[in-house]
Each structure stands twice: as structure tokens, then as C-alpha cells.
UniProtKB/Swiss-Prot annotation:
Protein name stated in the entry: Large ribosomal subunit protein bL19
Transmembrane segments: none
Record-linked Gene3D superfamilies: 2.30.30.790
GO cellular component: a single term: cytosolic large ribosomal subunit
GO biological processes: translation
Function summary: This protein is located at the 30S-50S ribosomal subunit interface and may play a role in the structure and function of the aminoacyl-tRNA binding site.
Gene Ontology molecular functions: structural constituent of ribosome
Entry's family note: Belongs to the bacterial ribosomal protein bL19 family.
Keywords: Ribonucleoprotein, Ribosomal protein
Domain of life: Bacteria
Gene of this entry: rplS
Length: 132
């Protein structure tokens, strides 16, 4: 009888595969991320390594989509550079992302702002939201 109780306690200590993955992911996640919503204008500090030096390059634009959750959470940031639309996808918990700062809140009524791709000039502006 003592053997069966020992075996059951060992089985209780062993985590299920999902719980093991969750515990590992929670240790890898960043906890200092701001609340980011679609439509916000954000400045992402991206780590760039050139030779043996490392520097942080800012990338500022409008968040047009958010995907996934947990460790694999990504945002797509769009900006216009020299008249050409440039989009980058950032994994929020990646070590390449040094910092994220919300510059201004946007007021939108969609979860994905892919319609901004077809717009030009002032039509790409997003109204500002003051309540968040």
C-alpha cells in the first residue's frame, strides 16, 4: 500500500504536457509590456547587431493587427517611409524587441486595419482616442 501512495504522489508532481509548456512559456514572457490595441501608434525599439556592436533602432507606426496570445503574440506595425508603405511583424516577447512605447491611442472600430493599405495620404490617419 505504501508503494501505491508513493507512485501517486510522483504522478501528481509530474506535469501534463500542456501545463509544462505553459509553465515554460510564462517564465519566458516579458512582464513590462504596455497595453497595446489595434489603431495605436507605437514606437518599437528593435535590437540590431552590426559586427560586434549592438544598437537599438526605433520603428514607429500604426498597429494594424494583433495575433495570437501568450509567448507567440505578434503585432503588425505599418508606416509610410519615403512614400512607400512598410509593414513589420514583431513578436512582442522576442529578445530582439528592446522596448515598446505607445505614442498615442487610436480610435478604430475594426480588429484588423488592412484597409489602410489601399489608402493614401491623409486618409491613412487614425482618429485619436483620449479615454484609455
Amino acid at each position: 500500500m505504501a508503494k501505491s501512495s508513493k507512485a501517486s504522489s510522483a504522478a501528481a508532481k509530474k506535469l501534463s504536457p500542456e501545463a509544462l509548456i505553459r509553465s515554460f512559456e510564462s517564465s519566458q514572457q516579458k512582464d513590462d509590456l504596455p497595453e497595446i490595441y489595434v489603431g495605436d501608434t507605437v514606437r518599437v525599439g528593435v535590437r540590431i547587431s552590426e559586427g560586434n556592436k549592438e544598437r537599438v533602432q526605433p520603428y514607429e507606426g500604426v498597429v494594424i493587427s494583433k495575433r495570437h496570445g501568450g509567448l507567440n503574440q505578434t503585432i503588425t506595425v505599418r508606416r509610410i517611409f519615403q512614400g512607400i508603405g512598410v509593414e513589420r511583424v514583431f513578436m512582442l516577447h522576442s529578445p530582439q524587441v528592446a522596448s515598446i512605447k505607445v505614442e498615442r491611442r487610436g480610435k478604430v472600430r475594426r480588429a484588423k486595419l488592412f484597409y489602410l493599405r489601399e489608402r493614401v495620404g491623409k486618409a491613412t490617419r487614425v482618429k485619436q482616442r483620449f479615454d484609455r
